[in-house]
Amino acid sequence: MRRYAILLGIGIIFWPTIGQPAAAASFSLGERERQDAIAAGRRSVVSEEFGGEWRARNAAGETLTVMTPFHRLALAARNAAFKGETLKPKDIQTAVKETDGKLTVWVTLKGPTADFARFYVPVLLDGKTEIKPTFVQNERTALREDGVFAARCLYVFPAATLGGKGRLTLVVRNPDDKEVSTFTVDLSAMR
């Protein structure tokens, strides 16, 4: 009986950690992480909350989606599962290669005119360190939604200096260097 109680106690101690997602974003996937991402994508077909850990909203109601390598591969597996297909090795390689070593961020910003975001400049703050993007694509012809224009912007940052566990701040500035939007990105809550 005592042995049973000890085993039960050990099981209770370790139970919350078994099967839980990794507690940090990874910018380069190993084979185990690739399989986990594919499995998560396949399972997500029946879940409406897929992608929640990679999305954020700021006080102004603007949205941000972080595309980590795990998220990209899980999304590819999800899309294949919707079609009743499995991912081919070539598809896996493509999904991993396009996001490996990068932090890709999709941001939807709101403004008064169709071209308001054209010259916006993003920067990622890691403490006091500013990380400049390697690629910026600001939408020049924003769509009108709910009386304001919504511009979908794509920003790619190098992940070489980023750990996977920190909190970062994405700051978007206008050409006059005035902050127009900020987002908190919690990498420790993402895979």
Where are these regions (language model features)?
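Conserved functional micro-motifs across diverse proteins
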Residues: A22-R191
